[in-house]
Each structure stands twice: as C-alpha cells, then as structure tokens.
C-alpha cells in the first residue's frame, strides 16, 4: 500500500490540490496529513474541506491548535505567527471545530510513527533540526520509519546499526527543482529514519512544495518535490486581503 504523507498546507488549497493530483498520478492509495492545515495562508476553510475529503489520517499541528484557541501561551502574547489563526477561529463552523478538536499530534499507522513536530513531547511542537534532537527522537520511538513536518524543510535523518546519526538528504535535496522530481532513499539493513516531509503550501525554506511517498512493506521511501508558483500564491494572498510575509516579498522583488 503506497502512502502519500503531507504536511503544512497552511490554508493554501491550490497547492494542496496540486499535490493530491500528483500523488494520485503516482499511484498513492492512502493519504496522511501531518497537521497545520490552517495558518499563514489565504483560505483555511477550503483547505480544511479538502483535507477532510481526501485524507485517511490527519494529525493536529500547532496552527490548528491555535485556530481552536488551545495555544494560549503563545496566542496571548500576540505572536504574529498566529494572527490568521485567531481570525480563522471566528470563521470555523461548529462541525469543523469539532473535527479539529478530535485530532491528535501523534499516531502510528502501518508500523510508521507520524507526528507534526517531534516525538518526545508532541504537544510542545519542538523542531527536529539538530543531531542531538534527532537522537532524542529516535530514542522516544521504536518504529523504523518516523515521519514529521513542522520545519517546512524536507530532510532525512538516519540512525545506523552502529548508532551513528547522519543526514543523507543534505546533498540530494539541495537544489530547487525546475520540474517535478522524486528523490528515493533505500533503507539500509538495521537502520532507522526520521523523514521530514517538508511543506505543501508554505515552503519558506525549501522554495518548492514537497511530500513523502512510502510503501511500508518495501525497502524504499521518497521525497517528492514540485515547483511552487510564488507569483500566483502572492496574488491569491492579496486578493483575499492577507498581508504578504517578509520572506515572500524578498523572494519576489530581490534580484
């Protein structure tokens, strides 16, 4: 059974539709969403609708939690990262709010561990971004394959039989693709992996949308990368009255 594992849509339904069509064309049969359907983007209601219609497994992310008013420690400090979540909170239907409240930040599916952020304390939304942090996360779980999002950067951490941590994605995910590409990783005997699937709808670091493809019964998993139309995205933001973030303005108007 081939899974498409996506994360961080961030209220960008057009990007999500693109990723879904791509995954289906590649033969994916099951769909997992690792959270952050809301936040940052221009149409959270449409994004929520698409996720509810198309995904078999859905996790809660920190922005989904903030949309429900559950991240009070951060929202009460007027963190600008949660501005659109506070706005979305008043626009959610009762049914959508109830559905969101039923989501969890961590699940195990087909022998794979899935989380939005990290696996040590899933509700604290920590980033897996350093070898020591990756080591702690490997220690928190027993599964051979762990998938997460949250950082908006696709990458792969590995733990060998000799307990050596490396990041085999460093060179292979370096360049921004001009066309769709699939980067396959062969699982080595006795090794374990943390796979960050990147972001579908808000790729502020990778500058391309990405998601993971995995058949748990095989010895291969992959990062699928697609070009991202930043110009159209910016126009959608403006037409919905959403301020463009500084990183996007810099990207659009720098030489």
Where are the regions a protein language model picked out?
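Active-site neighborhood of divalent metal-dependent phosphoester bond hydrolases
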Residues: 47-48, 54-142
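N-terminal active-site segment of His-dependent metallophosphoesterases
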Residues: 1-56
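Active-site environment of divalent metal-dependent phosphoester hydrolases
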Residues: 10-15, 39-41, 63-68, 120-122, ...
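Hydrophobic, aromatic-enriched interface-forming segments
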Residues: 138-168
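Active-site neighborhood of phospho(di)ester-bond hydrolases with catalytic His/Asp-centered motifs
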Residues: 6-7, 31-36, 57-62, 115, ...
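Beta-strand-turn-beta hairpins that frame and shape the catalytic cleft
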Residues: 1-4, 107-114, 187-194
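Short beta-strand scaffold segments in enzyme catalytic cores
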Residues: 106-108, 154-158, 210-214
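Acidic, His/Gly-rich catalytic cores of divalent-metal-dependent hydrolytic chemistry
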Residues: 161-255
């Amino acid at each position: 059974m081939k899974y498409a594992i996506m994360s961080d849509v961030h209220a960008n339904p057009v990007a999500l539709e693109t990723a879904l069509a791509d995954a289906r064309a590649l033969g994916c049969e099951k769909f997992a969403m690792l959270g952050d359907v809301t936040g940052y983007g221009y149409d959270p209601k449409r994004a929520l609708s698409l996720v509810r219609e198309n995904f078999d497994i859905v996790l809660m992310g920190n922005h989904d939690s903030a949309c429900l008013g559950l991240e009070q420690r951060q929202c009460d400090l007027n963190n600008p990262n949660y501005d659109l979540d506070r706005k979305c909170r008043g626009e959610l239907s009762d049914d959508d709010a109830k559905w969101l409240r039923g989501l969890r930040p961590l699940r195990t599916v087909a022998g794979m561990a899935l989380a939005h952020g990290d696996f040590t304390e899933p509700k604290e939304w920590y980033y897996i971004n350093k070898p020591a942090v990756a080591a702690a996360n490997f220690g928190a779980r027993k599964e051979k394959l762990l998938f997460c999002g949250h950082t908006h950067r696709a990458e792969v951490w590995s733990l060998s039989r000799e307990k050596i941590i490396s990041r085999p994605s460093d060179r292979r995910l370096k360049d921004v693709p001009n066309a769709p590409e699939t980067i396959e990783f062969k699982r080595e005997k006795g090794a374990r992996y943390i796979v960050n699937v990147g972001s579908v709808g808000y790729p502020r670091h990778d500058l391309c949308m990405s998601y993971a493809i995995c058949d748990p019964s095989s010895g291969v998993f992959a990062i699928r990368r697609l070009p991202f139309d930043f110009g159209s995205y910016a126009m959608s933001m403006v037409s919905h009255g959403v301020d463009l973030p500084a990183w996007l303005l810099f990207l659009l108007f720098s030489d």
